[in-house]
Swiss-Prot record:
One of its GO terms (molecular function) is ATP binding. Belongs to the class-II aminoacyl-tRNA synthetase family. Type-1 seryl-tRNA synthetase subfamily. This is Serine--tRNA ligase. It catalyses: tRNA(Ser) + L-serine + ATP = L-seryl-tRNA(Ser) + AMP + diphosphate + H(+); tRNA(Sec) + L-serine + ATP = L-seryl-tRNA(Sec) + AMP + diphosphate + H(+). The gene is serS. The lineage of its organism: Bacteria, Pseudomonadati, Pseudomonadota, Gammaproteobacteria, Pseudomonadales. ATP binds at residues 264-266, 351-354. Homodimer. The tRNA molecule binds across the dimer. It holds the Pfam family Seryl_tRNA_N. PROSITE patterns: AA_TRNA_LIGASE_II (PS50862). It comes from Stutzerimonas stutzeri (strain A1501).
Length: 426
């Protein structure tokens, strides 16, 4: 959530910056609500002062033996008007709050301005896509030939956009997640966490999925109980660890990592990536989250992105890094890098990680703060998150990049200890 004071005092500038994201801020509505709020607040304050004075005069009139009934009636009337004024203020503030919750984060000055993914800027590449001397198979064909990747049975169980993995491919999927967790905890300084997969609405509001993106979530409603939502990413549960907290500066940075399933309705993805594991309702992801002092968040973004890149480098998978333009960034991000891995069957790079600095946007929604050692006062932390990596898409990349002419799959060197010494699948 943006700073309401910033929105009030720099409304036109905020609107212009949001316009670069393709978001049209309802300036007229905000101005109208602010004008109403000021009018009602001024009237309420004047009425309160008048009521206080009238209450004081009751005692004085009583001492003089005067009839105080008219004064009492005035005080009661003013009390009713005050209550109405406070209710009106609450209504206006509630509408302003809902508006604020629907506004995306402001892009950082270093973010390239653009309308959509076509205007993202490539930052760097690593590795060279392999030139195969045989017809390349996609991961579906590679996995289905032995029955180890079974979309038909998954559809029988759950419908479209689910996968059933068996045998060595299931083991390879598990090996990838274990390798990622070990790398981030042993080499990159993250603390492993096991989090709930079901969260309630305040957690999703804190990280920005609610109220705007409820259609993208799977919701579980039970009569007489608060609704649950299946997490779309462990970013939700990991970041909300600090919700409502005032941290000691010495605790920062906090670095969490978790391997969880993620659940997404893919409401806007009709017709896209209908074959295979690229876009699923349920998929595993290793998620990294950092909670840092404000002055260190952009340095942390470079570190976080490098942590995700290291996974791809050790797996020897070619990839590129993009700086997302203003029109392609996620709702809560002030700056984002996407990592895209080479997928041979599609002859292009596909997203495998998104690493974002959210600034104080999520922290303000969650009221996550730290005590500034210089001032002694609580201030909002900055939050960052990134995939390290999406496990299913990494599996896709490994299957396709390590395939052999006979359909067998070589096991990447770094995964062999997790595969019980298996060197070839198939």
């Amino acid at each position: 959530m943006l700073d309401s004071k910033l929105v009030r005092t720099q409304l036109q500038d905020v609107a212009a910056r949001l316009a670069t994201r393709g978001y049209q801020l309802d300036v007229a509505r905000i101005e109208a609500l602010e004008a109403q709020r000021k009018t009602v607040q001024t009237r309420t304050e004047q009425l309160q002062a008048e009521r206080n004075a009238r209450s004081k005069s009751i005692g004085q009139a009583k001492q003089r033996g005067e009839d105080i009934a008219p004064l009492l009636a005035d005080v009661d009337r003013m009390g009713s008007e005050l209550e109405s004024g406070k209710q009106e203020l609450d209504r206006i503030q509630s509408e302003l709050d809902q508006l604020m919750l629907s506004i995306p984060n402001l892009p950082h000055d270093s973010v390239p301005v653009g309308a959509d993914e076509e205007e993202n800027v490539e930052v760097r590449r690593w590795g060279t896509p392999k030139a195969f001397d045989f017809p390349v198979q996609d991961h579906v064909a590679l996995g289905e030939q032995h029955g180890w990747l079974d979309f038909e049975t998954a559809a029988k169980l759950s419908g479209a956009r689910f996968a059933l993995m068996r045998g060595p491919i299931a083991r390879l999927h598990r090996a990838l997640a274990q390798f990622m967790i070990d790398l981030h905890t042993r080499e990159h300084g993250y603390e492993e966490a096991y989090t709930p997969y079901l969260v309630q609405a305040p957690a999703l509001q804190g990280t920005g999925q609610l109220p705007k993106f409820e259609d993208d979530l799977f919701k579980i409603s039970r009569e007489g109980e608060a609704d649950f939502y299946l997490i779309p990413t462990a970013e939700v549960s990991l970041t909300n660890i600090v919700a409502g907290e005032i941290l000691d500066a010495k605790q920062l940075p906090l670095k969490f990592v978790a391997h969880t399933p993620c659940f997404r309705s893919e409401a806007g993805a009709s017709g896209r990536d209908t074959r295979g594991m690229i876009r699923q309702h349920q998929f595993d992801k290793v998620e990294m989250v950092q909670i840092v002092e404000p002055s260190k968040s952009f340095e942390a973004l470079e570190e976080l992105t490098g942590n995700a890149e290291k996974v791809l480098q050790l797996l020897e998978l070619p990839y590129r890094v993009l700086s997302l333009c203003t029109g392609d960034m996620g709702f809560g991000a002030t700056k984002t890098y996407d990592l895209e891995v080479w997928v041979p069957s599609q002859d292009k790079y596909r997203e495998i990680s998104s690493c974002s600095n959210c600034g104080d946007f999520q922290a303000r929604r969650m009221q996550a703060r730290y005590r500034n050692p210089e001032t002694g006062k609580p201030e909002l932390v900055h939050t960052l998150n990134g995939s390290g990596l999406a496990v299913g898409r990494t599996l896709v990349a490994v299957l396709e990049n390590y395939q052999q002419a006979d359909g067998r799959i070589l096991v990447p060197e770094v995964l062999k200890p997790y595969m019980g010494g298996i060197e070839v699948i198939g």
